[in-house]
């Protein structure tokens, strides 16, 4: 009983208010720490001053490796860091890593399922040096075409935006690279819901109807055969406007007046030179030199590559692109699709009229020179 009474008294002490005596300070707790001291320096255990902070190149490479992370937020933040690094440095300085090292990590993100990742990817692509990107158009185009035919409508919209950026800085390279003309046109028709009538050995009502509807010289293009999906329901036609705008830019780069590599550009520039007779008897000396404005001037010969079909061929001149554009029925399909879009009116109708103007000017220039007579 004595021990039990003692324990009860000890417990009651916790709830009893101590009586303070006048003139005496309050008792300090057991865990009290005196902080009234003053010191000029604080010494930490295991402190090392030999380690240096990571350089900008190291941080850039680290965030570049994080682009393959499974976390959406990690990929988004890494893209934002890379974009900030590229935009903050002076324009005359090269990026911390070459574009040939940066692009392989960026290309798979064109097909990323996260919208914020794709948006940050487009910002990063626009921050890359334009003259360096032109040499890697052949690597970019397969991923862009894969995104344009993706099942998700949002990925298709983002891929077309990437194509619009690439056409704006390297339009000649986009339409002149292997598969850059025919395959990209097929992707555009797929995105917009315009289809070229396929040639079949079997007679059918649909085939005969589409064939009879096509005009001479315009191929066997058929009209729109299905409602295309342009992303979210609240977009109100804005993706379609962007698609048609980028299609107009793509056609202008390929067959429009801004198209490069006409057949006689090299000869004309050489003949107009004031020093054309300095290398007599060779008056067109520049035409005998290796082109210096191309990274791979003989890539079109495909000397060591696999054989290409008509879709994967390189069409370097404006005339060659116009021939295949008419022969494969793209002209008829695009004209009918633009006519349908023009009937919708509004912004869609205005943009479709611009694309139709590009076709009309190309027809007047090229068919007037006799490039469409033999088809």
From Swiss-Prot:
Pfam families: Ipi1_N. Keywords: Nucleus, Ribosome biogenesis, rRNA processing. It comes from the Eukaryota. One of its GO terms (biological process) is rRNA processing. GO terms for cellular component: nucleus; rixosome complex. InterPro entries: ARM-like, ARM-type_fold, Ipi1_N. Residues 1-35, 208-234 are annotated as: Disordered. It is found in: Nucleus. Residues 1-10 have a biased composition (Basic residues). PANTHER family: REGULATOR OF MICROTUBULE DYNAMICS PROTEIN (PTHR16056), TESTIS-EXPRESSED PROTEIN 10 (PTHR16056:SF2). Belongs to the IPI1/TEX10 family. Component of the RIX1 complex required for processing of ITS2 sequences from 35S pre-rRNA. Component of the RIX1 complex, composed of ipi1, rix1/ipi2 and ipi3 in a 1:2:2 stoichiometry. The complex interacts (via rix1) with mdn1 (via its hexameric AAA ATPase ring) and the pre-60S ribosome particles. This is Pre-rRNA-processing protein ipi1. The gene is ipi1.
